[in-house]
């Protein structure tokens, strides 16, 4: 059996989910299966190509829903998991079917897709997830922004955080598929020591320092919200906690950036804010207005690279909205 595993690319939780799914599937479903890993990214336009679903089984983890009959497994935890009302209706109908409901799973209450998948694999199928406790723990910390402080998040002392930097920045399409099996084979510190991994870290740490300097130069902080535009310095990703490292008093941060395949509006909130949940704006709902999505506390919108002005207009509107909703008017 050939299984194609589609995962959220450029994402630590996406890679961890793909690795854990593979372990679970091999142990509980198909011991002799072979696995191929295919990254998915949020971009303007179609997110899926039906022609890519070539496996005897096709799984999607940590990414939006597809109603394709070729999809045999789906796990996600994003509040904005459905591209359309029709997709959500398809999933709800699936839950009434005893076969389909044992293959497609969704719960936005989980911090990471990895921990959600671990819960389903253990409680529904009897899969032992104890050997993967470190992976599950760090997937929750990374995807849930559960770092102790902005300094910890930006200075990245832990192997999982350094792996996250590499996963988010790499341009080698073969790198993450090669990495995925190791995430459930070795401790994360040993994964980081692998020759094909270790050599990537020093230049990325230098790039990370340049990103800190650039965002420090560009960031505009007012009324509880940071805004920065770095579209004239194309980069494939940056540490999303840098704004709060620079302005720990901020509640929200909006970043406009450009990569090889999109212009991105990143819409985030400070994980260490003093604001209560009732004082916070649901960022997923804001992003959905522009075709994006995410979670209540963090989201993003993708535009084609050439539609930079449209992205800038959206970012400007969102900044104005969040500054008007500042939970601490004196800040």
Which sequence ranges carry the predicted segments?
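Glycine-rich, Lys/Arg-enriched anion-binding loops that position phosphate/diphosphate groups
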Residues: 144-238
């Amino acid at each position: 059996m050939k299984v194609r595993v589609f995962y959220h690319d450029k994402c630590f939780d996406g890679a961890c989910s793909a690795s854990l799914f593979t372990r679970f599937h091999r142990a509980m479903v198909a011991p002799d299966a072979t696995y191929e890993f295919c990254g998915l990214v949020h971009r303007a336009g179609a997110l899926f190509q039906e022609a890519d679903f070539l496996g005897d089984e096709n799984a999607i983890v940590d990414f939006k829903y597809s109603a394709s009959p070729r999809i045999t497994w789906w796990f996600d935890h994003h509040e904005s998991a459905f591209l359309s009302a029709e997709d959500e209706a398809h999933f709800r109908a699936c839950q009434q079917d005893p076969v389909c409901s044992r293959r497609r799973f969704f719960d936005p209450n989980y911090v990471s897709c990895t921990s959600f998948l671990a819960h389903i694999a253990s409680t529904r199928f009897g899969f032992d997830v104890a050997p993967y406790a470190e992976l599950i723990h760090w997937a929750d910390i990374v995807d849930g922004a559960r770092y102790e402080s902005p300094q910890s998040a930006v200075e990245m002392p832990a192997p999982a955080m350094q792996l996250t930097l590499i996963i988010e920045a790499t341009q080698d399409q073969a790198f993450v598929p090669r990495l995925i099996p190791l995430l459930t084979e070795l401790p994360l510190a040993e994964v980081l020591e692998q020759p094909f991994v270790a050599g990537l870290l020093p230049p990325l740490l230098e790039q990370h320092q340049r990103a800190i300097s650039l965002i420090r130069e560009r960031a505009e902080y007012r009324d509880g919200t940071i805004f920065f535009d770095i579209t004239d310095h194309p980069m494939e990703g940056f540490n999303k906690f840098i704004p709060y490292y620079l302005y720990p008093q901020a509640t929200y941060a909006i970043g406009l950036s450009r990569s090889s395949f999109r212009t991105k509006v990143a819409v985030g909130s400070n994980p260490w804010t003093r604001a209560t949940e009732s004082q916070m704006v649901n960022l997923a709902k804001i992003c959905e207005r522009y075709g994006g999505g995410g979670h209540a506390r963090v989201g993003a919108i993708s535009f084609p690279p050439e539609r930079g002005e449209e992205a800038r207009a959206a970012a400007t509107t969102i900044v104005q909205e969040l500054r008007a909703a500042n939970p601490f008017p004196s800040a």
